[in-house]
């Protein structure tokens, strides 16, 4: 259990009250035996609950590499969390930063999560809101990040970029190009290579995730459960208020830790779909459709494996 490792945290955790049992067993992906529109509805409901893109933007993902930093935890557990999150990222086709890299996923443990969130957002406001259109979830969501009582809270920044060049596609206060003399130097320069109403050069890349872990509320989890939960909310834009209680997902780990020891098939299929999606389609619905297709493919594969393992009748 992870509490065995927390002795080196900035402040120690306290004993936890066991979570109440869930009213019904969450749905395992391979157990979905319905077909047609019903299966599609289950998948679409899961994606709809989980996905939380920035306003008027598509779903963002990391483009090339991630670097995980862990603060205020004992070296052994800190290294484990970093390694496990990096492993999940590499499974998605990303590169993990070498030792000494500058973290773009920062995990901070504390016994006063709300206080730390408030301090960081007040003292380093620009790290949370850079001012570019579509780069974060907005002021109301930031207040929720500070004020809501959650075992793990997270804040992400993403950047709309030109997929051809990687250059920012939005104006960012304080940044400019050229001589920085007139208004044109303050605006992004996008050269359209092929105009289309169905495709776009502008895609959304995650550029920063800040995760705050309340050590008083995670003592009942295994190190793997905590690491995979953080990986899920760091590698994708996840709605912190998502109700996934009807599905077997790592996102339910605080309400029902016995349901999953690690990322589930629902979670893996969601991430697989996000990172395999063709992102030049116009509209958020296209992103969600590709994720839903990934989950359906995983369901079909799992059902085939289950059938293959069934004993053959004499």
Give the ranges of each region predicted by the language model.
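Sec-dependent signal peptide recognition
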Residues: 1-8
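Hydrophobic beta-strand segments of well-ordered beta-sheets in folded domains
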Residues: 30-31, 62-68, 209
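Compositionally biased P/S/T/G-rich terminal and signal peptide-adjacent segments
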Residues: 38-62
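Long, folded non-catalytic interaction modules
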Residues: 69-84, 89, 93-311
């Amino acid at each position: 259990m992870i509490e065995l490792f927390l002795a080196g945290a900035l402040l120690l955790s306290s004993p936890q009250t066991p979570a109440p049992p869930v009213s019904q067993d969450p749905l395992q992906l391979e157990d979905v035996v319905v077909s047609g529109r019903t299966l599609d509805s289950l998948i679409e409901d899961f994606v709809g609950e989980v996905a939380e893109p920035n306003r008027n933007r598509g779903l963002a993902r990391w483009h090339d590499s991630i670097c995980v930093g862990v603060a205020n935890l004992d070296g052994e557990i800190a290294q484990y969390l970093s390694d496990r999150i990096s492993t999940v990222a590499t499974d998605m086709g990303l590169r993990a930063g070498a030792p000494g890299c500058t973290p773009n996923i920062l995990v901070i443990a504390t016994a006063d999560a709300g206080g730390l969130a408030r301090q960081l957002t007040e003292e380093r406001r620009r790290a949370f809101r850079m001012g570019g259109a579509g780069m974060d979830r907005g002021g109301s969501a930031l207040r929720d990040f500070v004020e809501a009582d959650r075992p793990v809270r997270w804040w992400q920044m993403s950047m709309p970029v030109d997929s051809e060049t990687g250059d920012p596609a939005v104006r960012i206060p304080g940044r400019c190009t050229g001589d920085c003399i007139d208004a044109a130097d303050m605006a992004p320069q996008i050269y359209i290579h092929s105009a289309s109403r169905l495709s776009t050069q502008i895609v959304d890349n995650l550029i920063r995730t800040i995760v705050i872990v309340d050590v008083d509320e995670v003592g009942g989890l295994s190190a793997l459960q905590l690491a995979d939960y953080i990986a899920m909310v760091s590698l994708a834009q996840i709605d912190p208020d998502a109700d996934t209680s009807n599905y077997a997902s790592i996102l339910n780990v605080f309400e029902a830790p016995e349901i999953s020891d690690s990322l589930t098939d629902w979670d893996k299929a969601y991430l697989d779909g996000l990172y395999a999606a063709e992102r030049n389609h116009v509209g958020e619905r296209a992103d969600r459709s590709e994720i839903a297709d990934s989950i359906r493919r995983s369901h079909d594969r799992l059902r085939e494996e289950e059938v293959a393992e069934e004993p053959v009748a004499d």
